[in-house]
């Protein structure tokens, strides 16, 4: 049976709409183990915003929590509007069975701390910790705040049990600050007051009932104003104000063992001040530390970076009614993955045109080559294991582009009876489309470099009418061993024509699969200086620009090699789309080794048969939905 509390609260929200925050419920049976009511679950609060790394660090942190604890978690995620949907998609797709979460709109509370002068890099996100007793609902008694740069090495429930040690006056639990900052030994800094070394606010245990009763909301503001008159601003953000408050109200703090916030910042003296074995590592510095023990602890952090998050919560395949005995079942890709949309970058303003693509680590160099040529926005989904995706994230960050948005899609473990995991190409395309903040999207694959006159492609895109797409001719080297310097082709149609006439370049797949791109009619393209229309032919699969709001999603049952683009273009034809060709732009294929799925297609007749069957089913279903009779 589900807990009466959960059911009652769910019904209250359903029928009265009185919940003050959005919630996703994942009901799980669990046994009451605690000494007071909150101990049958652990309630945690996070502030997630600012730099994209915050989301990646949150996932890294929560992996460490899940690794050592199977308790039930209730997370309170305090985010701004930009981050809420991304974190929601991460948590929903991760599908952790022993966790439910609630969102609180940080934007609504920003003004309550914006008046505080602050020179700390955390900006108002750090100061917002002061508002947690105001943000969290009045029906909640205890909660622990966590910075996302903390890695646990123990069961977090052991820390949660520290609430048992609070006396009647204690409202906060914190670890001592493991540096000399608040001692101000050199006397040169305008340091806020603190008890001794002060306390670090990376982890704060809040007794919310007592805080509300004691008038925290007004008292901390009085303290802040008092010391702002002296110091002018905060140097350590919220930590200065918390410590000044504790200085004035010393009976309200309980000191937590230092092992639960072993600080690794640039100024810390954790090794000499904390002899205990570290249980929670706090990487609380923008700069890498050069301490002797930092490298050792950084390896622990990197291990959680590389840890497969799916190992912490394995999920069932999302296919319903599939039978393991069906020979075609093993050729279907998974279609349920852990996702972080906008993991790197975000298109805050709608763009006119952006490239939409997808890739995995083995095609990273191709993406970098493509991105160097395409100077417009890019929305791309990236697929791989946790370690692979973080390596890719670092490489893309080094491009120093603000118009590239990366959506991370984490590879899932396959079932024992399945063949190798199929690359979920259409799932990835759909992710990249969904999160592209663009009016028009150029659908391409990452092993193509799009070249030509970008000014005219924007103009041609703007002239598209309803149910028209703009095809970008796809070309390739005639001989795979040829290596042409693509930088020479950036806007040189004349050079391309020269190579076409010399037969060193040809239409993509012209000899081995002519129906795929030959209908683009490259002979006409050579002579044209304006867009021209081409007829759809069977198995045509061009790359094209389309209005995003008109673009149907790709069928996610097609993964790896085989019919994944053909079926999408076929659907456009059934919807009466017209295919116009850009006379000024083109794309050139970057050679690469054959993928695993292509090799499988070539050697496995069952694979080919199953995908042909799936293609026919797709055609019939699409035709039926559109009211078309197939010939």
Swiss-Prot record:
**Main location as per UniProt:** Golgi
Q: Which residues lie on this side of the membrane: Lumenal?
A: 28-631
Upper classification of the source organism reads:
Eukaryota, Metazoa, Ecdysozoa, Nematoda, Chromadorea
Q: Does the keyword Acyltransferase apply?
A: no
The UniProt entry, under InterPro entries, shows:
Glyco_trans_8, Nucleotide-diphossugar_trans, Xyl/GlcA_transferase
Q: Which GO terms describe its molecular function?
A: glucuronosyltransferase activity; xylosyltransferase activity
Q: Which residues are glycosylated?
A: 95, 105, 167, 177, 287, 400, 485, 502, 521, 529, 593
The stretches that face the Cytoplasmic side, renumbered to this chain, are 1-6
The protein's topology relative to the membrane is:
Single-pass type II membrane protein
- Tell me where the transmembrane regions lie: 7-27
Q: What does this protein do?
A: Probable glycosyltransferase.
Q: Which family does it belong to?
A: Belongs to the glycosyltransferase 8 family.
Keywords assigned by UniProt, alphabetized: Glycoprotein, Glycosyltransferase, Golgi apparatus, Membrane, Signal-anchor, Transferase, Transmembrane, Transmembrane helix
| Cell compartments where the protein resides | Golgi apparatus membrane
Q: Which GO terms describe its cellular component?
A: Golgi apparatus; Golgi membrane
Name by which UniProt lists this protein? Glycosyltransferase-like protein LARGE
Q: Which GO terms describe its biological process?
A: protein O-linked mannosylation
Write the Enzyme Commission number(s) for this entry.
2.4.-.-
């Amino acid at each position: 049976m589900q807990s009466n509390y959960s059911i009652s609260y769910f019904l209250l929200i359903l029928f009265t709409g009185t919940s003050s925050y959005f919630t996703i419920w994942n009901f799980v049976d669990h046994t009451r183990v605690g000494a007071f009511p909150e101990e049958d679950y652990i309630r945690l609060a996070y502030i997630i915003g600012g730099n994209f790394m915050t989301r990646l660090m949150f996932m890294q942190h929560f992996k460490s929590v899940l690794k050592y604890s199977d308790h039930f978690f209730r997370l309170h995620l305090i985010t701004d509007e930009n981050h809420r949907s991304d974190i929601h998609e991460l948590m929903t797709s991760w599908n952790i069975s022993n966790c439910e979460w609630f969102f609180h709109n940080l934007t609504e509370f920003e003004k309550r701390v914006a008046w505080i002068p602050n020179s700390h890099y955390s900006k108002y996100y750090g100061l917002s910790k002061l508002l947690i007793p105001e943000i969290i609902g009045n029906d909640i008694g205890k909660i622990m705040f966590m910075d996302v740069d903390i890695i646990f090495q123990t069961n977090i429930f052991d820390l949660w049990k520290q609430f048992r040690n609070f006396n009647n006056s204690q409202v906060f639990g914190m670890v001592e600050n493991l540096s000399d900052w608040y001692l101000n030994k050199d006397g040169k800094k305008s340091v806020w007051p603190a008890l001794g070394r002060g306390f670090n606010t990376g982890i704060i245990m809040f007794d919310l009932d007592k805080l509300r009763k004691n008038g925290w909301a007004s008292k901390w503001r009085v303290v802040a104003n008092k010391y702002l008159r002296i110091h002018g601003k905060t140097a350590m953000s919220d930590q200065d104000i918390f410590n000044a408050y504790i200085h004035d109200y010393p009976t309200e703090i309980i000191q937590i063992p230092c092992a639960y916030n072993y600080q690794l910042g640039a100024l810390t003296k954790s090794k000499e001040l904390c002899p205990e074995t570290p249980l929670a590592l706090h990487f609380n510095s923008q700069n890498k530390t050069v301490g002797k023990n930092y490298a050792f602890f950084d390896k622990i952090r990197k291990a959680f970076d590389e840890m497969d998050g799916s190992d912490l919560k394995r999920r069932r395949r999302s296919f319903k009614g599939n039978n393991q005995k069906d020979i075609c079942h093993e050729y279907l890709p998974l279609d349920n993955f852990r996702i972080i949309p906008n993991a790197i970058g975000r298109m805050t303003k709608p763009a006119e045109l952006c490239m939409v693509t997808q890739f995995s680590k083995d095609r990273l160099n191709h993406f970098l080559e493509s991105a160097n040529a395409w100077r417009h926005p890019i929305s791309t989904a990236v697929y791989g294991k946790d370690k692979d995706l973080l390596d890719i994230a670092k490489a893309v960050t080094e491009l120093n582009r603000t118009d590239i948005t990366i959506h991370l899609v984490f590879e899932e473990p396959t079932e024992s009876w399945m063949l190798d995991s199929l690359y979920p190409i259409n799932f990835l395309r759909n992710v990249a489309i969904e999160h592209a903040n663009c009016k028009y999207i150029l659908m391409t694959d990452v092993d193509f470099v799009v070249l030509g006159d970008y000014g005219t492609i924007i103009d041609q895109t703007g002239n598209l009418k309803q149910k028209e797409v703009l095809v970008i001719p796809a070309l390739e080297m005639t001989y795979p061993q040829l290596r042409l310097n693509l930088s020479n082709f950036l806007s040189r149609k004349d050079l391309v024509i020269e190579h076409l006439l010399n037969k060193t370049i040809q239409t993509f797949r012209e000899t081995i699969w002519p129906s795929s791109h030959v209908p683009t009619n490259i002979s006409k393209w050579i002579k044209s200086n304006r867009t021209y229309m081409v007829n759809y032919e069977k198995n045509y699969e061009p790359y094209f620009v389309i209005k995003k709001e008109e673009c149907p999603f790709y069928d996610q049952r097609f993964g790896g090699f085989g019919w994944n683009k053909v079926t999408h273009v076929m659907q456009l034809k059934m919807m009466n789309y017209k295919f116009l060709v850009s006379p000024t732009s083109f794309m050139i294929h970057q050679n690469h080794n054959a993928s695993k799925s292509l090799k499988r297609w070539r050697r496995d007749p069952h694979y080919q048969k199953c995908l042909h069957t799936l293609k026919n089913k797709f055609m019939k279903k699409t035709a039926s939905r559109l009211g078309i009779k197939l010939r």
